């Protein structure tokens, strides 16, 4: 029989860190800390499978699960000496989510569960502090009404702010017991008026309401969005943790906080974190009050005049420091820890591997290798490949005179410039229109996740380094400044009030997430140097990986950038991109509109020196590294004007009648150009195009070899081949031109002719095509289109719906479909090598920079992946991780 509930407490636990898939990250680590003998409030964890059962039961909690939870609560009662629902020494509970990977702020929590009109009196009596009891009760009502009953926070906050204004209070901590009791009555009245029901007084009703709400939050809009952004499977579900409450709001000897064993922004080996006196944990995480530094060094560096925990609570600080060191050594990774101090006693509420900036991840991994804590291979595995994008963020030029209009905390490194927007929705709209924006919020909430993802940067006027905005921005690699108390956001009038300046929506600002500064206007930036810790990690990765990493580059500038990122060749040069530039488009149109072959050849003679110059530049930059050049691929109509205005403009420039040009454009029109007259089909229809391109390639190879002294071995790729006979025809053209150029130059040129495998038929007939092809490069963009029968340009109309409804887990145009497209690649690779055992195999679609797709390429033995220049470091790291993981 399935066990639904696992207990922990009093130094014993029924699970541990190894059980994170079943117990979720929070539950597994609570059990682990308990078994280590650390001070953990007793509790129980409902396994994540129960979440899926909850959904399959139509949102009903199983009776057997209820029975196991009741038994678990009885065990908590035995340890604490308190009783759930009792009017004497009542046991209060927290109910928290716990997915197997951290999803900060995306799911729901309920604290102080078990309070009602009677137990609040008992709690006040036991604690000797009626104010604390009523404060806890109002927190519970507000949280429960929001999470379980669906009544948002705003109305409650409005009541509280009105009451504080009437009483002349600025802070929540200034309210007395009687005043909190009145707030509670107002909260309960609001619930009755808005929902037509009373706030539940039965603790068990409260319990099952909270458990159901936590399960339900797994499918909340914000959680679904977060999982899609971070590729977390829908089917995992969340565990639920029910734990005895400990209180950080029991006066000035109590506190709550979050600590990192190392700095999550810089990676510095020093305790780092924030705390609030007389508060509960949600106050820190939600950014409702700006917290104080845990350490004295942290206080001094932030310029705060608020006392640190190190000075204010020295005994608790010493114990926290000891536990942090123990946990980091136990888990062999930087830890993110939540704690509460209840009247001087420290309690550990959570530990997990902390989210960190990529720069911090690099430093922590390198330092831990130097400290002999982890191996070089483990260090390589510690870096999320896609997070390397963070290192490519520009930084503000240090020579620039900064006009600082606000300062805050440096929550996520990098700099960003954009127009001010005040809502997440505006950020999403701006991204869709191609505009760069900075999202301004007093504090972000999980509902802002879509806007945070769309923005170039994030600025909040409240919150600390562990607030929602800070944690999420670091995870996304978005520059972020939080707690900018020198600024004020006027939400109603859409204004930002800074130091000596008032800005409105649409005005440009720059934020420096590394320095915590807000600057007026656009500021010059510089690209970072990828050295130091990055260089060491990538060096270890390069030693470990088997596959080479090439780049998709069409210009010498792209090639230079890619080489600086470690590219070992060009896996795809799209020659058609060269024809769209400047005057070339006019010559290309002249060729297309020519009446006969003679006219086409005259135009191609003009294009030849242009192409030769392009290829010479690429060969020179790559200095003997392999360069794969794809012959002209798109249909000819793509080079022609489309609208009547464009037709008139082009006709005038070319000395043609608009009507004649329109007729030629219409004649070239295709109903389905993706599957039409393109690729090798164009080459066969107009072999003179192939002849020109081949001559440009070989003449450029001669020129570059003379210039660099390095042998140039062009790899010429024929696109959209489905038949061996197609490749034979085009290859014969290429070979003939190669012979002519070699004779003219008086030198031998080594070269390869291969094909893109981008049609299912080509994959299935790879053993036959390999008789003529010397290499295969899998064009995964078109292979995905032709395998699924989905146009990539139209997929956005329904792929997100498919993901949301669980039809597919990932967008197949972003991460390779292993079962279908991947199977075709495997078949083609095996059959191709059966014919030609030394055949070179690679991929050159967008998937070449996707870590999951790269792991697949390693598994089936491809020789290289090729991706855009800025994804080369990602591919290098992912290729290494694929080898290391396979060998572990």
Labelled PLM ranges:
Residues 45, 49, 444, 463-465, ...:
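Short, ordered loop/turn segments at secondary-structure junctions
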Residues 345-347, 438, 445-453, 467-471, ...:
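Glycine-rich phosphate/ribose-binding loops and adjacent secondary-structure elements
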Residues 407-447, 498-536:
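Extended, non-globular alpha-helical segments
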């Amino acid at each position: 029989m399935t066990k639904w509930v696992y207990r922990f407490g009093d130094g014993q636990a029924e699970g541990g860190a190894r059980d994170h898939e079943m117990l979720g990250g929070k539950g597994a680590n609570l059990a682990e800390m308990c078994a280590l003998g650390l001070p953990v409030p007793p509790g129980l964890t409902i396994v994540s499978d129960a979440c899926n059962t909850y959904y399959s039961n139509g949102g009903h909690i199983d009776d057997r699960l209820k029975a196991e939870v009741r038994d678990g609560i009885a065990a908590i009662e035995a340890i604490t000496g308190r009783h759930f629902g009792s009017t004497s020494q009542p046991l209060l509970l927290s109910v928290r989510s716990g997915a197997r990977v951290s999803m900060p702020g995306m799911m729901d929590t309920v604290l102080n569960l078990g309070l009602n009109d009677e137990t609040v009196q008992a709690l006040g009596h036991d604690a000797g502090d009626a104010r604390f009891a009523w404060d806890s009760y109002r927190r519970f009502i507000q949280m429960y009404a929001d999470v379980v009953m669906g009544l948002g926070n705003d109305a409650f906050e409005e009541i509280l702010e009105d009451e504080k204004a009437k009483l002349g209070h600025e802070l929540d901590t200034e309210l007395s017991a009687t005043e909190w009791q009145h707030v509670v009555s107002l909260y309960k009245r609001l619930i009755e008026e808005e929902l037509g029901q009373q706030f539940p007084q039965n603790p068990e009703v409260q319990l099952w309401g909270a458990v159901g709400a936590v399960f339900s939050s797994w499918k909340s809009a914000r959680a679904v969005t977060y999982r899609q952004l971070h590729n977390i499977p829908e089917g995992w579900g969340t565990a639920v943790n029910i734990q005895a409450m400990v209180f950080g709001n029991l006066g000035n000897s109590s506190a709550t906080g979050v600590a990192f064993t190392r700095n999550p922004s810089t990676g510095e080996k020093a305790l780092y974190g924030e705390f609030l006196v007389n508060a509960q944990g949600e106050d820190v995480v939600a950014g409702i009050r700006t917290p104080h530094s845990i350490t004295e060094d942290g206080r001094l560096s932030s310029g705060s005049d608020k006392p640190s925990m190190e000075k204010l609570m020295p005994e608790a600080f010493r114990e926290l420091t000891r536990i942090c060191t123990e946990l980091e050594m136990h888990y062999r990774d930087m830890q993110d820890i939540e704690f509460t101090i209840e009247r001087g006693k420290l309690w550990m509420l959570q530990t997990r591997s902390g989210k960190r900036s990529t720069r911090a991840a690099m430093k922590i991994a390198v330092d831990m290798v130097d400290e002999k804590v982890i191996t070089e291979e483990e260090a390589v595995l510690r870096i999320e490949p896609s997070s390397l994008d963070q290192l490519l963020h520009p930084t503000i030029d240090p020579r620039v005179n900064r006009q600082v209009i606000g300062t805050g905390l440096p929550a996520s490194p990098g700099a960003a410039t954009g127009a001010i927007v005040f809502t997440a929705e505006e950020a999403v709209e701006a991204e869709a229109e191609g505009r760069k924006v900075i999202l301004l919020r007093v504090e972000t909430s999980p509902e802002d996740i879509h806007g945070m993802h769309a923005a170039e940067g994030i600025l909040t006027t409240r919150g600390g380094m562990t607030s929602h905005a800070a944690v999420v921005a670091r995870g996304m690699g978005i520059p972020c400044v939080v707690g900018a108390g020198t600024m004020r956001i006027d939400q109603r009038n859409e204004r930002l009030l800074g130091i000596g300046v008032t800005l409105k929506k649409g005005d440009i600002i720059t934020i420096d997430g590394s320095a915590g500064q807000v600057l007026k206007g656009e500021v010059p930036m510089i690209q970072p140097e990828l050295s130091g810790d990055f260089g060491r990690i990538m060096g270890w990765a390069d030693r470990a990986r088997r596959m080479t990493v090439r780049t998709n580059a069409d210009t010498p500038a792209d090639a230079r950038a890619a080489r600086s990122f470690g590219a070992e060749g060009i896996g795809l040069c799209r020659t058609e991109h060269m024809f769209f530039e400047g005057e070339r488009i006019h010559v290309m149109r002249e060729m297309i509109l020519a009446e006969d072959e003679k006219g086409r050849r005259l135009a191609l003679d003009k294009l030849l020196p242009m192409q030769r110059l392009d290829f010479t530049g690429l060969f020179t930059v790559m200095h003997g590294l392999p360069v794969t050049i794809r012959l002209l691929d798109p249909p000819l109509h793509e080079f022609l004007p489309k609208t009547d205005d464009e037709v008139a403009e082009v006709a005038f420039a070319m000395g043609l009648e608009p009507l004649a040009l329109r007729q030629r454009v219409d004649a070239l029109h295709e109903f389905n150009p993706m599957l039409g007259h393109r690729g090798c089909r164009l080459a066969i229809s107009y072999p003179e195009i192939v002849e020109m391109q081949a001559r440009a390639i070989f003449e450029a190879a001669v020129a570059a070899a003379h210039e660099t002294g390095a042998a140039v071995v062009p790899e010429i790729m024929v696109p959209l081949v489905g038949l061996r006979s197609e490749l034979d025809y085009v290859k014969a053209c290429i070979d003939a031109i190669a012979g002519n150029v070699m004779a003219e130059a008086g030198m031998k040129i080594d070269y390869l002719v291969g094909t893109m495998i981008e049609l299912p038929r080509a994959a299935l007939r790879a053993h036959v095509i390999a008789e003529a092809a010397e290499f295969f490069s899998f064009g995964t963009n078109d292979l995905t289109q032709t395998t699924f029968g989905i146009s990539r340009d139209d997929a956005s109309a329904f792929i997100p719906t498919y993901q949301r409804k669980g039809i597919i887990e990932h967008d197949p145009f972003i991460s390779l479909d292993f079962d279908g497209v991947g199977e075709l690649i495997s078949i083609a690779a095996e059959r191709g090598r059966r014919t030609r055992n030394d055949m070179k195999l690679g991929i050159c679609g967008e998937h070449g920079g996707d870590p999951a797709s790269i792991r697949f390429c390693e598994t089936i033995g491809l020789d290289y992946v090729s991706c855009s220049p800025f994804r080369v470091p990602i591919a290098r790291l992912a290729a290494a991780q694929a080898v290391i993981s396979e060998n572990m």
